[in-house]
Amino acid sequence: MTGERPVHLTAIIGSFGGAVENLGAAHGIYAFAVPPEQIVEFCRFLKEHPALEFDFLSDICGVDHYPETPRFETVYHLYSLKNKWRVRIKCRLGEPPHVPTVTGVWRTANWHEREAWDMYGIRFEGHPDLRRIYMWEGFEGFPQRKDFPLRGYKDKLNPFGAEGPPPTQPDLATNDIPQGGR
């Protein structure tokens, strides 16, 4: 995807003008930044446009950019089975992080969005069943956030949680690695 701009990229930029920011391409995957309020419309356009047909939602990832602002981001990876094209959509979110659900565009978004909710606390507005998928109901916090305690929170299931100093770590920069032996 070098040289002349591909037809599908021209269609994307032409249809959304200044609302969609072209982030360029890496490894043949074009990336776009889309405001949260336009994510559903943009995704539906990518799926339904006859020249594009991004019919496969590979995944949705949550990203925590702490301490940057905006802190959170959702990243959508799409694939067109017909055209064999990939595209990445990035959506920066304020706090508390929330974005409309794309389950009305791709049903598989259901599980991907539940995972981003469970790990990062990103709320997908309009999701049909937004509940934890890995952690148990009643779990406090979101374990993939950068401010989540590395040892977890202290509770009955984790009596050695956040209180107390962290375990000592070897200093890899000085090769101060403890030597095991027999």
From Swiss-Prot:
Major site of localization recorded for this protein: membrane
UniProt key word Cell membrane: yes
E.C. no: 7.1.1.-
Cystine residue pairs: none
Cellular component, GO, one term: plasma membrane
InterPro entries: NADH_DH_suC, NADH_quin_OxRdtase_su_C/D-like, NADH_UbQ_OxRdtase_30kDa_su, NADH_UbQ_OxRdtase_CS
Keywords: Cell inner membrane, Cell membrane, Membrane, NAD, Plasmid, Quinone, Translocase, Transport, Ubiquinone
Top-level taxon: Bacteria
Compartments, as annotated in UniProt: Cell inner membrane
MF term (GO), any: quinone binding
Known catalytic reactions: a quinone + NADH + 5 H(+)(in) = a quinol + NAD(+) + 4 H(+)(out)
Renumbered residue ranges of the record's region Disordered: 153-182
Keyword ATP-binding: no
Membrane topology designation: Peripheral membrane protein
Function (record text): NDH-1 shuttles electrons from NADH, via FMN and iron-sulfur (Fe-S) centers, to quinones in the respiratory chain. The immediate electron acceptor for the enzyme in this species is believed to be ubiquinone. Couples the redox reaction to proton translocation (for every two electrons transferred, four hydrogen ions are translocated across the cytoplasmic membrane), and thus conserves the redox energy in a proton gradient.
HAMAP family: NDH1_NuoC (MF_01357)
Entry similarity comment: Belongs to the complex I 30 kDa subunit family.
Subunit (UniProt): NDH-1 is composed of 14 different subunits. Subunits NuoB, C, D, E, F, and G constitute the peripheral sector of the complex.
Name of this chain's protein: NADH-quinone oxidoreductase subunit C 2
